[in-house]
């Protein structure tokens, strides 16, 4: 990635935009401009991906307010979900979406030797997070018990509270934000000698990494500790109850922060983090949570809805959560990585459902355009019939890429059992060629380094590519990604230039590049 070229483009765009004056008028300032003189080359996947990484990073950064960026109609550090201001209006900053966006920014920062422009964007995000935490809102305030107001899902781009009706609270946001910022502190220590980049700037609410830990990360973690066993709305903002995705990212945030708390001599809190993370791990895996359902042999995203017979429990969140909480090359105590048999079976069953559900998938034999969940009726601007989502499809590509990367990088054997058998046998390899007696066995182990292992690893990458081919076939000509693609025609629909869509594709390309770089 040639960051100098990319950021010079941003600077030119910024100079052409009007400065913000007076009260917020989100419709007065355009924040979308297509990547200069670019048109998607649909000739082949390799050609597309080689250029698209730079293009998707452009569109992601375009939706972040910071001095070197294009979007200036917001407090520095603000992430808009989309420039779309009507039909639908996504011109807000969501706690969850912002944190996930910055996890992608951190991936770029880590892969590019702590690029200081990206580091500044991250620190502006941390700064605006401090202010948002202390903005009273319909969910509560910072001074409430366990900082109740941190469960507020979204804010206006000027940092003021959004006071309209919404699904409140959403308990995944504080956890994801705590994890993202904690990960940045580790990057600062490992890649930049513990030095922040904005401490000499005005209007910054921290002067050290300890300030960030005590005043920004810790309050989010206290919220998680206080409310992890309370119901809230899911990541799709539609249903209140217990959610696999929410509990998983909460467990990740707590477990990840234990060592950080210890590094700042906060031993008692580290113990609380550790014990609560352990409780959450048991809750995720056990009968209390109800997420692992052996009757159906897959993860149930919302057990309450299954009990009410309103949903079967299949949901792309059951593989998005594992991907977000298990970065490549990271040692993690968080359960349910993508190699978990129940996660894989959930992934497989959703794929099988979506192949039949969405007419656009009739053109594909392997990967497919994937939606949020089978019962979805949100069409991008109202209710009728749900569509596939670009981000769900990009994350679907990441699953086999990560399976291949983890197995090859650690020289791990690949174990196939009765639960994940259908996925491997249908899409990756004919298991009868490996073990003719497999179906009478409990499992088969494919030894690392064997010819069969190399075949499976290569086929996993090919299978991941089949999802990116779907994206190539339906991405906008300018390389931007909407929220959805029409279930019949494949044309883009819903909010345009969705930040999360670009981020999910970026992460898929990153994973693909890393697994292909392995010998």
UniProtKB/Swiss-Prot annotation:
Print the keywords alphabetically.
Answer: Carbohydrate metabolism, Glycoprotein, Glycosidase, Hydrolase, Polysaccharide degradation, Signal
Q: Where is the active site?
A: 234 (proton acceptor), 237 (proton donor)
- Spell out where the chain is glycosylated: 115, 127, 205
This entry's Gene Ontology molecular function terms read: glucan 1,4-alpha-glucosidase activity
- Could you state one GO cellular component term attached to this entry? fungal-type vacuole
Known Pfam families for this protein?
A: Glyco_hydro_15
The record's PANTHER family line, in alphabetical order, gives: GLUCOAMYLASE, INTRACELLULAR SPORULATION-SPECIFIC, TREHALASE
Q: State the family it belongs to.
A: Belongs to the glycosyl hydrolase 15 family.
Q: What is this protein called?
A: Glucoamylase GLU1
Q: Which gene encodes it?
A: GLU1
């Amino acid at each position: 990635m040639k960051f100098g070229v990319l950021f010079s483009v941003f600077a030119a765009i910024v100079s052409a935009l009007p400065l913000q004056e007076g009260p917020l008028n989100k419709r007065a300032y355009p924040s979308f401009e297509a990547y200069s003189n670019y048109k998607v080359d649909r000739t082949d996947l390799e050609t597309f991906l080689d250029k698209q990484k730079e293009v998707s990073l452009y569109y992601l950064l375009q939706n972040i307010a910071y001095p070197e960026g294009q979007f200036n109609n917001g407090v520095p550090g603000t992430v808009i979900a989309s420039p779309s201001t009507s039909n639908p209006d996504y011109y807000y900053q969501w706690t969850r979406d912002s944190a996930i966006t910055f996890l992608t920014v951190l991936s770029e920062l880590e892969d590019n030797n702590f690029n200081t422009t990206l580091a500044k964007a991250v620190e502006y995000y941390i700064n605006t997070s401090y202010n948002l935490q202390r903005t009273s809102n319909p969910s509560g305030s910072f001074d409430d018990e366990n900082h109740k107001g941190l469960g507020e899902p979204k804010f206006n781009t000027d940092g003021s509270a959004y006071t309209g009706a919404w699904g409140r609270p959403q308990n995944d946001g504080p956890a994801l934000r705590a994890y993202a910022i904690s990960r940045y502190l580790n990057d600062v220590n490992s890649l930049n000698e513990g030095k922040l980049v904005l401490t000499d700037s005005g209007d910054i609410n921290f002067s050290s990494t300890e300030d960030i830990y005590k005043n920004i990360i810790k309050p989010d973690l206290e919220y998680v500790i206080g409310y992890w066993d309370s119901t809230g709305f899911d990541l799709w903002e539609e249903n209140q109850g217990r959610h696999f995705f929410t509990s998983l990212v909460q467990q990740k945030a707590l477990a990840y922060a234990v060592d950080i708390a210890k590094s700042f001599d906060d031993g008692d809190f580290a113990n609380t983090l550790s014990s609560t993370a352990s409780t959450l791990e048991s809750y995720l895996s056990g009968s209390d949570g109800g997420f692992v359902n052996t009757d159906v042999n897959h993860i149930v995203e919302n057990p309450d809805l299954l009990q009410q017979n309103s949903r079967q429990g299949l949901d792309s969140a059951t593989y998005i959560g594992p991907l977000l909480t298990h970065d490549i090359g990271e040692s993690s105590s968080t359960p349910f990585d993508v190699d978990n048999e129940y996660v894989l079976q959930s992934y497989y069953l959703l794929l099988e459902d979506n192949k039949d559900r969405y007419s656009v998938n009739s053109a594909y034999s392997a990967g497919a355009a994937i939606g949020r969940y089978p019962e979805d009726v949100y069409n991008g601007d109202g209710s009728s019939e749900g569509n596939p989502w670009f981000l769900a499809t990009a994350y679907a590509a990441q699953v086999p890429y990560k399976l291949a990367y983890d197995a090859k990088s650690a020289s791990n054997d690949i174990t196939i059992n009765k639960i994940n058998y259908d996925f491997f046998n249908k899409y990756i390899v004919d298991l009868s060629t490996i073990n003719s007696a497999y179906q009478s066995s409990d499992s088969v182990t494919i030894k690392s380094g064997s010819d069969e292992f190399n075949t499976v690893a290569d086929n996993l990458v090919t299978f991941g590519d089949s999802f990116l081919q779907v994206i190539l076939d339906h991405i906008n000509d300018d390389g931007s990604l909407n929220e959805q693609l029409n279930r019949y025609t494949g044309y883009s629909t819903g909010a345009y230039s969705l930040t999360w869509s670009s981020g999910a594709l970026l992460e898929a390309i990153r994973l693909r590049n890393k697994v292909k770089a392995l010998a």
